[in-house]
Regions:
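Activation segment/activation loop of eukaryotic-type protein kinase catalytic domains
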Residues: 154-188
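Glycine-rich ATP phosphate-binding loop
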Residues: 24-59
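Catalytic-loop of the protein kinase fold
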Residues: 142-159
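Conserved catalytic-loop aspartate of Hanks-type protein kinases
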Residues: 205
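A conserved short helix/loop substructure at the end of the activation segment
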Residues: 243-246, 260-272
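Conserved short submotifs of the Hanks-type protein kinase catalytic core
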Residues: 97-110
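Short beta-strand micro-motifs within the conserved protein kinase catalytic domain, predominantly
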Residues: 87-100
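Activation segment of protein kinase catalytic domains, centered on the conserved DFG
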Residues: 117-129
């Protein structure tokens, strides 16, 4: 695929669409369209013809360093090499203000809007297919030794023609001149170690996938009612995660929790995650349509209740990629680590003498959950949970359909 310069006068019907993060986004018609095929007789490339495209502004490119340009070029090549990534055809420049813009293939809808419009009609088979397409696309990005850095439901795009989900915005996340002591992204999807100031790695992308998996299950963005970025950042670092939606398949839940573990080394790599999602999709594809329809009907009312309760609280300003700058944040941890310290203080205050062997081997989880119910450590049971380590045995991971029901 050729990355080309698109003359601005070759674009028509340019209309403002929205503001995506710090970039203004427009729709347009590219008169000539992309290169489609090679005409061996005429010995020239044949163009597609009139084509709808997206124009995305690039901020402060003139101040970018050489590394930014090298990374941008590499990611452009990746996006045009693999069909699972939204294609970027090239660059153009608005002559009225001198701003550079990406010329990108246009999709039909993003994941956030799609879920909000269709959640009550989606079966688990359809939801897992979404997760499958996303993890497949990310596996390709990681195989090219690249990192996305800003995965969220606004840049997961759907093509009705191809019936496939794509990842977009690869390599152009944030301003070119972003300060080194700041981070850029959509806060609910940013990994805790990145929030606390560490470098972004592939495992940070995996954390974002965990948040997307939860959004696919619930139909709503995570932490949708938070008003304060700093409070949300601190809670994420301290182990707060969204509450698992009732009816979520156990295998899916386990993978999701592994993805959002506070310790990056505990998260699966993308190949392991993709294999898990793929096996789950295969399982659901072998289930009869009758059982799938029963499962969809059973979840319909539950999803309506979830969506109605969550939609009242959505803070649209939170779900925008932007620059964040947090100082003096603690090291990320899973909530069980922080809770254990709180419980030890409670035991001392109540003069509770516990047998360590009993606590470790017989009832640790039960004791801790009882203490959580008795003492309110700023946990809202209706909206978020301080996520515990996965206590399921290996036997729990086996797929079963007891009494014709899907779990």
């Amino acid at each position: 695929m050729i990355i080309e310069w698109v003359p601005y006068n070759n674009l028509q019907n340019i209309e403002y669409l929205t503001k995506g993060g710090i970039s203004e986004i427009y729709t347009a018609v590219w008169i000539d369209g992309r290169y489609e095929e090679w005409d061996s007789k005429e010995q020239k490339l044949i163009r597609y013809g009139r084509q709808e495209v997206i124009l995305k502004g690039l901020e402060n490119v003139e101040n970018a360093n050489q590394r930014w340009f090298e990374e941008a070029e590499s990611h452009l090549k990746i996006s045009n090499k693999w069909p699972q990534i939204v294609q970027c055809f090239g660059l153009t420049q608005n002559p009225s203000n001198g701003n550079y813009m990406l010329v990108i293939d246009r999709a039909d809808i993003d994941l956030r809007k799609y879920l909000q419009e269709t959640q009550n009609q989606l079966s688990w088979k359809e939801r897992i297919k979404i997760a499958h397409d996303i993890t497949l696309a990310l596996s390709i990005i990681h195989s090219e030794s690249a990192i996305h850095r800003d995965l969220h439901s606004g840049n997961i795009l759907y093509s009705k023609l191809n019936q496939r989900w794509y990842i977009s915005d690869l390599g152009f996340c944030g301003p070119a001149d972003k300060l080194t002591d700041s981070i850029y992204g959509n806060l609910p999807y940013i990994a805790p170690e990145v929030i606390s100031g560490k470098n972004t790695t592939k495992k940070a992308d995996i954390y974002s996938i965990g948040m997307l998996m939860w959004e696919i299950s619930s139909g709503q963005p995570p932490f949708s009612y938070y008003e304060n970025d700093y409070n949300l950042a601190l809670n994420i670092i301290n182990g707060m995660r969204p509450k698992v939606i009732s009816g979520t398949p156990l295998k899916y839940e386990n993978l999701m929790k592994q993805c959002w573990d506070a310790d990056p080394s505990n998260r699966p790599d993308i190949d392991t995650l993709f294999d898990g999602i793929y096996s789950l999709l295969q399982y659901y594809q072998n289930i009869s349509n009758e059982i799938l329809q029963q499962e969809t009907n059973n979840n319909l009312e539950n999803n309506k209740i979830i969506n109605n309760s969550m939609s009242k609280h959505i803070n649209s300003t939170l779900f925008t990629s932007k620059i964040h700058k947090f100082k003096n944040l603690p090291e990320p941890k899973n909530a069980i680590e922080g809770m254990s310290r709180k419980f030890s203080k409670v035991f001392k205050k109540l003069n509770i003498k516990s047998n360590n062997d009993i606590q470790i081997n017989y009832g640790k989880e039960i004791v801790e959950q009882q203490q959580i119910r008795q003492y309110n450590f700023n946990i809202d049971d209706e909206d978020e949970t301080y996520d515990y380590k996965n206590f399921h045995s290996e036997e729990d991971n086996v797929f079963e359909i007891p009494d014709g029901k899907i779990i």
